[in-house]
A protein has these predicted regions:
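Immediate post-signal peptide segment of exported/extracytoplasmic ligand-binding proteins
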Residues: 20-31, 64-70
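Structural motif
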Residues: 68-94, 151-154
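Sec/Tat-exported extracytoplasmic proteins
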Residues: 33-39, 54-61, 93-96, 101-104, ...
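Extracytoplasmic "Venus flytrap"
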Residues: 30-51, 76-82, 104-107
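Extracytoplasmic ligand/sensor domains, especially the bilobed periplasmic-binding protein
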Residues: 97-159
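Gram-negative bacterial Sec-dependent N-terminal signal peptides
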Residues: 1-22
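Signal peptide-proximal N-terminal region
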Residues: 48-72
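Aromatic/hydrophobic pocket-lining residues that form π-stacking "cages" and hydrophobic walls in ligand
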Residues: 11, 50, 112
Length: 159
């Protein structure tokens, strides 16, 4: 999770539209996953990893352009439901997040990716494997794991 978060933090910083006070920059990172429903344990684990990464970054005292950056995590539950997923995506876009970690499954990731793309918000899915996610042509959509096509070939060759 730390590597995923580091990638997202870098993407968010590259697209930096942070809120600035006199002293600190605030970098808002969104997290969306199922924290309710049948696979809530996976979403909660993922969110906990993101919270740990935010805490570590804030403890390090990261600076951007000579100003101390404060990272904030805005977490939303999509319950692994596409309708809730798009509502969560819009909520994070409206909150002006700098980047998003999520969604956890392809069924919520794909419809949410258009919302993030339209808003110019980088999105990194830690586990969506449907090839459509990164083949839709959205420049803000990134994946951490291989898609189903890449997973299937090596698996099929061992059968």
């Amino acid at each position: 999770m730390q590597n995923n978060f580091t990638l997202l933090a870098g993407a968010a910083l590259a697209a930096l539209s942070v809120s600035a006070s006199a002293q600190d920059l605030v970098v808002k990172i969104g997290h969306v996953g199922p924290t309710s429903g049948a696979i809530a344990h996976l979403g909660k684990d993922n969110e906990n990893g993101a919270r740990m990464a935010v805490d570590e970054l804030n403890a390090k005292g990261v600076t951007i352009g000579g100003k101390k950056a404060k990272f904030e995590l805005l977490a939303e539950d999509d319950a692994a439901d596409p309708k809730q997923g798009t509502a969560a995506a819009q909520k994070l876009v409206d909150a002006k997040v700098n980047g998003v970690i999520g969604h956890l499954n392809s069924g919520t990731t794909i419809p949410a990716s258009k919302i993030y793309s339209d808003a110019g918000v980088p999105q990194i899915s830690p586990s969506a494997t449907n090839p459509k996610y990164t083949r839709n042509g959205y420049k803000t959509a990134f994946r951490v794991v291989a898609d189903d096509v890449h997973w299937a070939a090596p698996w099929a060759s061992t059968r």
